[in-house]
């Protein structure tokens, strides 16, 4: 009698390519062959397509975005998006990614959870005391020690008071840190176990300097201020956001007040040193109003295709539905828009998008057990 382990490898690979990222843990238990092929499939695909997570209306969605057929309309694969059901009963407020693990922070005083989407394991993070209960104003960073990959969570407890503590996943223990970056920290991303933040000087406009600052989870300290390839004026019409490039480089998007969008990528980055290269510069005033009119953007880049895929932080609407749009932007004014994540405008959904909960994070699967 034939079994599923007898199926041709090419057929199994085709099946696995259609399985949502969060369902692969069930596939892995099917048989040894499927387990091995799922690892090859998923780790190989991360080099060919964008795998990531997007947060919309306090829900988490896995997303696949393949640019392989970009130059040939008939071969272009539309992005797929699927809601993550494992966390459906809780409203997710923030998500932080570090090399295959997700730190999910919920609305209210619920404990955060670290989740491995590939293996399916979870670990809940208990506060040290009632005084340390989680607040909406708390900020987080997620990283690990260099030598043993011991994962840690940094929290800015009521960050405007300059109170910082750190959680060690191995020992399940919190401790207070005597650190002070002496700056206004905005957004951050994890790269090679460290977290790099876009930050501004605590000073009055218009002489506010902006820069990067790194938190090293091995030393448990903030590093020196690192230069950016631009200077933002701090105007409401400006926007700065960070993104990782295959967990190897850092990219920064800067939208100027005059509508010019610039994207830079690091050629070298360490806690005390950074070098930048210009990746893309476009004038958004020549683009459709629905894109130009959006102030905030989230993005990832494809170095091989030399394009940026940019998402607005709010949906677009029709009489019947709402949907998200990805804009593929290249040099010479190249622009392609792709719709996905359609939601009907009925009483059940009630136009349920929430622009404050939009998040985009690339994903590389992890074999870390929780």
Swiss-Prot record:
- Read off the Pfam families from this record: F-box, FBA_1
Put simply, this protein is called F-box protein At1g66490
Show the PROSITE patterns listed in the entry: FBOX
InterPro entries named among the record's database cross-references: A_thaliana_F-box (IPR050233), F-box-assoc_dom_typ1 (IPR006527), F-box-assoc_interact_dom (IPR017451), F-box-like_dom_sf (IPR036047), F-box_dom (IPR001810)
Instruction: Using the record's annotation, list all stretches that form the F-box domain.
Output: 1-46
Name the source's superkingdom. Answer: Eukaryota
């Amino acid at each position: 009698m034939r079994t599923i382990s007898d199926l041709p490898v090419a057929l199994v690979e085709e099946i696995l390519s259609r399985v949502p990222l969060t369902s692969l843990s069930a596939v892995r238990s099917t048989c040894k062959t499927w387990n091995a092929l799922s690892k090859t499939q998923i780790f190989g695909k991360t080099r060919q397509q964008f795998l990531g997570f997007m947060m919309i209306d306090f829900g988490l969605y896995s997303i696949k975005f393949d640019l392989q057929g970009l130059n040939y309309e008939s071969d272009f694969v539309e992005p797929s998006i699927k809601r993550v059901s494992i966390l459906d009963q809780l409203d997710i407020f923030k998500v932080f990614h570090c090399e295959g693990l997700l730190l999910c922070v919920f609305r209210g005083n619920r404990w955060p959870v670290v989740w491995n989407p590939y293996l399916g394991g979870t670990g809940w993070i208990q506060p040290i005391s009632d005084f340390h209960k989680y607040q909406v104003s708390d900020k987080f960073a997620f990283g690990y020690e260099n030598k043993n990959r011991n994962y840690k969570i940094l929290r800015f407890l009521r960050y405007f008071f300059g109170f910082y503590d750190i959680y060690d996943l191995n020992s399940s223990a919190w401790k207070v840190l005597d650190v002070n970056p002496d700056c206004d920290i905005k957004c951050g991303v994890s790269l090679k176990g460290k977290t790099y933040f876009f930050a501004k000087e605590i000073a009055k406009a218009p002489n506010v300097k902006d820069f990067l600052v790194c938190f090293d989870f091995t030393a448990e300290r903030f590093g020196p201020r690192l230069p950016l390839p631009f200077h933002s004026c701090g105007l409401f019409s400006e926007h700065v956001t960070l993104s990782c490039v295959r967990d190897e480089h850092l990219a920064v998007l800067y939208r100027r007040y005059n509508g010019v969008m610039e994207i830079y990528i690091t050629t070298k980055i360490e806690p005390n040193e950074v070098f930048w290269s210009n990746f893309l510069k476009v004038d958004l005033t020549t683009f459709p109003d629905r894109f130009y009119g959006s102030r905030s953007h989230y993005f990832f880049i494809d170095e091989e295709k030399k394009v940026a895929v940019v998402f607005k932080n709010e949906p677009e609407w029709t009489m019947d539905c709402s949907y998200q749009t990805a804009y593929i932007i290249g040099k010479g004014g190249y622009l392609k828009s792709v719709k996905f994540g359609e939601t009907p405008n009925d009483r059940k959904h009630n136009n349920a998008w929430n622009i404050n909960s939009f998040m985009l994070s690339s994903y590389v699967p992890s074999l870390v057990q929780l």
